[in-house]
């Protein structure tokens, strides 16, 4: 693990697994090795469209492939140095669909994941959802009826399970603001479809 993380140097050069080492070679261990190895990392990533939150699927790359030293935020003042060990067991705490963009939390720490997405998590997730009507709307009627708005707030089921109450409001004429405390697969898109709306953008 230390070799994979780049913490072992042979004559000043990072060692590789299986490398043969001469008896006279100078072996060094990065002094941060023990402290960094004990630390579990959490990464905040702005996921672009076209990446999946978790494992690769249907030819699309997982968002974790964007976690590199080169992509680190220039103004990040954290003293922790990036190494490949940070990618081990780095899992998303929540999900964003492949065609959604926004904040994705990746963590090695199960405690962080539980706080964010556990059944009793108090953390709310906010989304801006651009929508359009799936069917022609009669003149004088709104895309979303009062009954439809009430259903979005409370009273829907997905896959036979009732959804937790949500806060939904209009952000502008074609964009809804959703505040959720859970994250089922394609939840917002499916909720919108149930009230006759299609999603054209989600962040």
Describe each PLM feature range:
Residues 1-203:
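Basic, flexible Lys/Arg- and Gly-enriched helix-loop patches that mediate nucleic-acid binding at interfaces
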């Amino acid at each position: 693990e230390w070799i994979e993380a780049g913490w072992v140097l042979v004559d000043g050069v990072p060692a590789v697994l299986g490398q043969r080492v001469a008896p006279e070679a100078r072996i060094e261990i990065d002094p941060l090795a023990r402290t960094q190895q004990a630390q579990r990392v959490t990464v905040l990533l702005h996921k672009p469209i076209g990446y999946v939150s978790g494992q690769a699927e249907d030819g699309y790359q997982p968002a974790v492939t964007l976690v590199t030293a080169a992509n680190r935020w220039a103004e990040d003042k954290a003293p922790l140095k990036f190494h490949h060990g940070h990618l081990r067991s780095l899992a998303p705490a929540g999900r964003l669909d492949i065609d959604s963009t926004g904040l994705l939390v990746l963590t090695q720490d199960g405690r962080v994941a539980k706080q964010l997405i556990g059944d009793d998590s108090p953390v709310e997730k906010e989304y801006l959802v651009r929508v359009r009507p799936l069917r022609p709307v009669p003149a004088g009627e709104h895309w979303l009826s009062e009954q439809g708005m009430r259903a979005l707030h409370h009273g829907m089921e997905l896959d036979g399970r009732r959804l937790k109450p949500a806060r939904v409001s209009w952000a502008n004429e074609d964009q809804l603001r959703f505040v959720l405390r859970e994250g089922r697969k394609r939840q917002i898109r499916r909720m919108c479809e149930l009230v006759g709306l299609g999603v054209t953008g989600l962040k």
